[in-house]
């Protein structure tokens, strides 16, 4: 049976992308791949849900390429790999986008726009870019079920979330507490600690800081000898100073009383600060035995005298004057307390305590009975001085009675309504003067500040608004994750992390310092907290299902708490989409439900939503509507836990953590076994991509220009997935050209000659043992490659797998096997040798198409179908298995030796600009042992042919013909032998020729340097050989080659003959001649070339397929060829005969 292999004019991977994708879509190939594995063992994969309210970026291609590679690989290994897409539809990203598009703020919700209208807008907006996401998913070849995705706003999804929360409630892991929490005024909600620890949340900012002077009311005698006495306390947040109610010292820290002057006004003062920090505020040159009577602030050197010292515990209980007396906090304030958290790393060793704005402050104040400074608003609620918008409470929002009784209104009114950070004030920019500056200036005028300076420090920002957070007292619901901390740590030890350092480092340390999870969010669009409480909080219920809530509503109707059941048309226990579409579990619908407590009191829902990260972390359960549906599948291990997940490193304390935490608390296990944490995709200069900076890369344009395969191959093979990728389209182009171009050209070569010779791929196979050595070598390498790629992909190392394939295709298959076998394909008849060459190349290409399929699915499929001639996709095929009987390690090593030696010799040729077509006389190699010599001898003819050298001579190193020098690698040896490195370097460079030979032969060498045992490895040094006259020498590892570069007249003549052949072959190609066409060649007589043709006539004629090769005194219509020393006119025409 005859068949033709498809041939192409050029490689257009973008077109291949489109054509193969169209075929997949038409034949629903993804679905077919699942059907083909029906009944096979399952490989469980979880897709992290992106939000479709924003466009996908190039970094999404990276994460999805990793996921798709592993899932395709596992499918080819015989597993059924279900991949369910998901959409993250709740939370701040959506709400902030809607607020921006509607031109409103959070404060407008419920006023100018109803909660129902607002949430309806959120529901519409959240799926705005679904088509773009689906388009990118298809175009990049990511196989995932987008027709049946899990959607976090779906009522059935929310029902599972409620069930999970009810389970946590039953276990005593859900509680309400009033604590200091991270709070985002810009977003209007509290944040969890894992949200605050997203990459980039902590940023260096330049703020005004000050060392404030707190006047001591009961100074010790030593403090009364030089002006008023003050405690010095440093703060990076001067806006918190009006809320100060205590100063905290370390009980065992030593504190000094120092006589000095205020550096701004020269007023004599005595200050108290920690001894270790004395010289951060005072120049040692200013210390004096007697303090002068006065000081001029114009002088740079501030005089000071240390007069006494005490332990911090001896200062406990001392009282001081309120620094900024706007509000009277009541009894127990303005005294010194002790705390173990106080350090002397910076500041003054005395910490200013504002209990309403710091967790440590709140804890130590409560322990010492120090009250927080609170205001009472018009509703009668006690509030901190800063409101939820991030500003000092406007006086109009406060209880007039409280203002009159407890506040100094004239002083407070100057700053009332001022935002504590310019970022919260729409009318201010970063350049405007901040509240901190104004407060510091005020204190300076009052002799209440010792130092004011700008300082860069690390400050937390909201992960979604990019604006600073505050630490703020909030009434929130928490998950008691700390109760399961040890179990989470133990479960983490069972997870296979790629890289391991993320699991033991970033993730492991996070678990070790775990804090309870702040679940509450004061927002509108999200999963409502399913807790109903009485007004006094004495009775409450945590609802765990829609059916339970339905029944509780029925009870409330009977008790007269509600007029009717708003879910009257809903049928409990019927889990269809149509039934659940009759209800809405979002606000404001659930807010209007009032339940009846066991004692007959009304219970209303706690208005908070839950953290959106709980939504995504619950997806292993919620995507299955567990436990209401699919209970058996979840509990028997069919769909839980995941065998594999992968997302960006930014999810380490996000999705990875919430998946792990929820599963540990609910099921006692982690929800995933293997996780690949990929790095960031940066621009080519290493900067973060952003539309604002104009350095973002459009994934759609990139795929359109290059095709998905080069993009995916570049991303996978450029660096390990967990390393940051400096994305450069030049790299994508290089992959397209070098890897795909080489593979395409190899296939084109095969198809061209296979079609000429009628090879079909169905001929009886030549037995492996009967095939020539070159065939057995490439098949051995191919089977070694299969094992390597299989091992690497099974170990979640796609980078190593891809690089191994690239190396095989470019170096072994194309540059070595095909090049060395070309003449076999050109031979006339279909001999056994020629058939073996075809079958070997066919097998190699077919196997490569399968190996590369997980990484580059489009071209692999095209190549596979072109080779097989069948309509079946490579993605339905099984992954290749190595045939160990065809693996010959000795043959591989010999050929590798030939490749290495050839590469070294060709590099020497390039050094002196000697073309390979120019024959040379001698190559000299000092073999380090008999085994290396035998290895080289087995491929000696091949080496000589490759490098175009007439003779290979082996020499003994001990003959002294080649002299070697050795240098230490400081980067490798320094960390191991730092203390003796200088002496070691001298010892290495002084090694004898015999010692160098010993190192090359054994791979290691032991010596003792300055009493320290040293073991050198070959990689620890650089060995170079000195050139000898007329020769060039090169070293690589334990291999040395020396090349005789003398060109005799005889050698030059042969070189010119080869050069002429090459030039004529180029003319044949440019003239469009077929491979089989004969030609007539006429050369213009030339002294040099006449002699060359005479000496090598038969060789030249055979190589260029010349029917006639003649020299003439005149050549018409010829081509001029430049041979450096002369120009030759030549005429090449197709033979007419």
Swiss-Prot record:
MF terms from GO for this chain are: aminoacyl-tRNA deacylase activity; ATP binding; isoleucine-tRNA ligase activity; tRNA binding; zinc ion binding
Catalytic activities = tRNA(Ile) + L-isoleucine + ATP = L-isoleucyl-tRNA(Ile) + AMP + diphosphate
Q: What superkingdom does the record give?
A: Bacteria
Keywords recorded for this protein, A-Z: Aminoacyl-tRNA synthetase, ATP-binding, Cytoplasm, Ligase, Metal-binding, Nucleotide-binding, Protein biosynthesis, Zinc
> Where along the chain is ATP bound?
691
Classification via SUPFAM superfamilies: Anticodon-binding domain of a subclass of class I aminoacyl-tRNA synthetases (SSF47323), Nucleotidylyl transferase (SSF52374), ValRS/IleRS/LeuRS editing domain (SSF50677)
What are its GO biological-process terms?
isoleucyl-tRNA aminoacylation
What are its cofactors? Answer: Zn(2+)
- Location of motif 'KMSKS' region in this chain is 688-692
User: Could you name the Gene Ontology cellular component terms for this entry?
Assistant: cytoplasm
Q: Where in the cell is it found?
A: Cytoplasm
Q: What is its EC number?
A: 6.1.1.5
Question: What is the uppermost EC class here?
Answer: ligase
'HIGH' region (motif): residue ranges: 50-60
The record's section on InterPro entries has: aa-tRNA-synth_Ia, Anticodon_Ile_ABEc, Ile-tRNA-ligase, Ile-tRNA-ligase_type2, M/V/L/I-tRNA-synth_anticd-bd, Rossmann-like_a/b/a_fold, tRNAsynth_Ia_anticodon-bd, Val/Leu/Ile-tRNA-synth_edit
- Assembly information from the UniProt record: Monomer.
Present the record's domain note.
IleRS has two distinct active sites: one for aminoacylation and one for editing. The misactivated valine is translocated from the active site to the editing site, which sterically excludes the correctly activated isoleucine. The single editing site contains two valyl binding pockets, one specific for each substrate (Val-AMP or Val-tRNA(Ile)).
Q: Which family does it belong to?
A: Belongs to the class-I aminoacyl-tRNA synthetase family. IleS type 2 subfamily.
Reported function: Catalyzes the attachment of isoleucine to tRNA(Ile). As IleRS can inadvertently accommodate and process structurally similar amino acids such as valine, to avoid such errors it has two additional distinct tRNA(Ile)-dependent editing activities. One activity is designated as 'pretransfer' editing and involves the hydrolysis of activated Val-AMP. The other activity is designated 'posttransfer' editing and involves deacylation of mischarged Val-tRNA(Ile).
The protein in question is named: Isoleucine--tRNA ligase
Coding gene? Answer: ileS
